[in-house]
Every structure is written in C-alpha cells, then in structure tokens.
Amino acid sequence: MVTVEEVRKAQRAEGPATVLAIGTATPPNCLDQSTYPDYYFRITNSEHKTELKEKFQRMCDKSMIKKRYMYLTEEILKEHPNMCAYMAPSLDARQDMVVVEIPKLGKEAAVKAIKEWGQPKSKITHLVFCTTSGVDMPGADYQLTKLLGLRPSVKRLMMYQQGCFAGGTVLRLAKDLAENNRGARVLVVCSEITAVTFRGPSDTHLDSLVGQALFGDGAAAIIVGADPLPEVEKPLFEVVSTAQTILPDSDGAIDGHLREVGVTFHLLKDVPGLISKNIEKSLVEAFQPLGISDWNSLFWIAHPGGPAILDQVEEKLALKPEKLGATRHVLSEYGNMSSACVLFILDEMRRKSAEKGLKTTGEGLDWGVLFGFGPGLTVETVVLHSLTT
C-alpha cells in the first residue's frame, strides 16, 4: 500500500516553475495619443466642454503614452450612444461585447505562446484566465478552452475583476500549480478590453478622466512549467518566490465598481506616493534571503499604472533611468493594459536582451523583480531569475 507521503512526493516537481513561452495580442484599432482628446470629446458629444478638454489634453500629453489599441471603434460607439455618456445605463451592451471579445483576444495571444512553446496543446494541464471585465457563466476560461480546443479535463481557474496587480497574481498561482503537480503545463492568459470602462467626461469626476487617458486593450499569454524538457522546451525565466501585500493606510486608493453604467473607476488618494513609500519594504522582504540589497543590480518589470508611479519609484529607490526602460516602452506603445502589462514587459525584455546579444533574458543580469500594483492598494512582488538567451 502506498502512503500519502509517497503520493505527495511523487506529485511534486523537482525544480522551480519556469516561463516557457510568451505571446501577446492587441485589437487592430490603434489610436494616436496626441490626437485622442479631439477624437474622445467629439465621439462623446462633449466638444462644448472646452476647459475640460484642455485638462484632458494635458493629461494625455503628460501620460508618456504614444498610442493605444482599443476594441471600441467609432462605428461601435455610434451604435451605442449610452456608452458615450458619463453615466447612462449601458451594462448589457458592454457585457455583450466583452464576453465574446475577451476570450477571442486571449486566444490570439495564447496561440502565439503555444506556437513558441512548440508542444501540442494537449499537453496543457491547467488554464488560468484573468480579466478585469465581462463576468459570465460559464466564464472566459471555459470559452477559451472551447476556442483553443483544449482537453475537456484541463483544470481551469477564472480570475475576474482583480485589476492592475493581477499580472503578478497569475504568476504566483501558476508557480504553485506547476511546482505542486509534476509535469503540469499551465497556460496563463490575461485579456483586457476597456469597453466596460469607456465613458464620456465629467467635470466633477476627474479621476474617471485619468482612466480614459491611460487605459488600453491587450492580451498576453504565457506557458509555465517546472522541470523543462531538455532540447525540447526553452525556459526564459525561473519564478523563484512570490508575495502579496495590502499597503497600510491605502483603503479606497483605487476602486472600481460594477454598475448599470459599466465599471466606474475611482482614484481617491496619492497612489504614486503610497507605492513609492512602501516599495522598498517589499523589495527587502523579497531579496534579503538572497543577500541582494542593490536595487540597480536587478532587472525591473513594474506595472506601469501611470508615469507618476514610475517617476516616484525611480526617485525613491535611486534607480538608474534605464532600469524602467522596458516598462516605460510598453506604457508608451500600449498604455495601461491592466493585468496584461507586466507580461508584455516580460516579452519586451527577453526580446531586447536577445537582440542586443546580452547573456541573459534579464538584460544580461541574473536576478529581477516583477511588481503588480492595483486596487486595495495591493502589491504583488515576484522574484525572477533570468536564463541564458
């Protein structure tokens, strides 16, 4: 008779979870940030609000974003005028779009990741799907399973409505799944579409306008597994440790609420200040066991909530400007895509590292940190170890 201990030992992987492939996707509709205020105030019938438009123009100019991709086109918005108002009942129309489009965009990213991984999709044992919008039953995880033709026995986990820290959360979950199920191959998909948060401007709610200036659409997928098959799988990063914490005195700093009008977005406190004040504590807790205290010796992947967060983190930790280079690049090319952002940055970093002929996937460095920041204020900290390019 086999003991529980023996079963448990056989279930566990030998080595740490590794990222084996990354894929990304965006909707085809690309919007230039410099002309976005003209488009936005026209499509929302708000051109008479000239002062507000000037404020929005300044927000967009300061955003450090060049362009964003959005599923919502002018044609779609003309068909749904309630989505262009600030507070008009429109949840049904929004839901009808996102329950279809979120799994579809997720599939595009997943197909690219599976292709890079190079293994048959029948070897995927687990699926983690993450999105901030489109709660439905059965969920986007089920829809993606059908779209990709995954096995019906794939073990699914659906994460709805987490927000911008969740790119770190999915790595934490995928690590635990991969390391505790020998041979597991976890497909992780973050798919974000702003059709639930898009709304017209309001003079009295400038925090909502901040969201309109920053958010973009995108999906990212990764394959995570421990004990990569030699000569068959090519690991990119090892996921060494993970942590999650709620920052002190940050209640209500970032909120999102599902209403008849869609998801409303609220910024109540000094978010960049709260993050920069507390970030070193998370770094010390994560890297002290490794004997690392020089934050410039790490490669950096930080959720780009907005330029002020990056500027204040950089200043607080005395980071060299190039440390947040990959993060700022993704912000400028795509905007804030919520949970998908950090996976886009991970992809950008390994690609640039290979193009430049650097010795590791982490800009030539061995150790790195991935941060997710979002509602709560919740911070996810992931310690990564790079591998040879």
Swiss-Prot record:
PANTHER family according to UniProt: CHALCONE SYNTHASE 1 (PTHR11877:SF80), HYDROXYMETHYLGLUTARYL-COA SYNTHASE (PTHR11877)
Protein name listed in UniProt: Chalcone synthase
EC id: 2.3.1.74
Biological pathway: Secondary metabolite biosynthesis; flavonoid biosynthesis
Alphabetical list of CDD domains matching this protein: CHS_like
Highest taxon above the source species: Eukaryota
Keyword rRNA-binding: no
Catalytic activity: (E)-4-coumaroyl-CoA + 3 malonyl-CoA + 3 H(+) = 2',4,4',6'-tetrahydroxychalcone + 3 CO2 + 4 CoA
Disulfide cross-links: none
Keywords: Acyltransferase, Flavonoid biosynthesis, Transferase
Main EC class the enzyme belongs to: transferase
UniProt-annotated catalytic positions: 164
Swiss-Prot/TrEMBL GO biological process terms: flavonoid biosynthetic process; polyketide biosynthetic process
UniProt similarity note: Belongs to the thiolase-like superfamily. Chalcone/stilbene synthases family.
Gene: CHS1
Molecular function in Gene Ontology: naringenin-chalcone synthase activity
PROSITE patterns named among the record's database cross-references: CHALCONE_SYNTH
Cross-referenced InterPro entries: Chalcone/stilbene_synt_C (IPR012328), Chalcone/stilbene_synt_N (IPR001099), Chalcone/stilbene_synthase_AS (IPR018088), Polyketide_synthase_type-III (IPR011141), Thiolase-like (IPR016039)
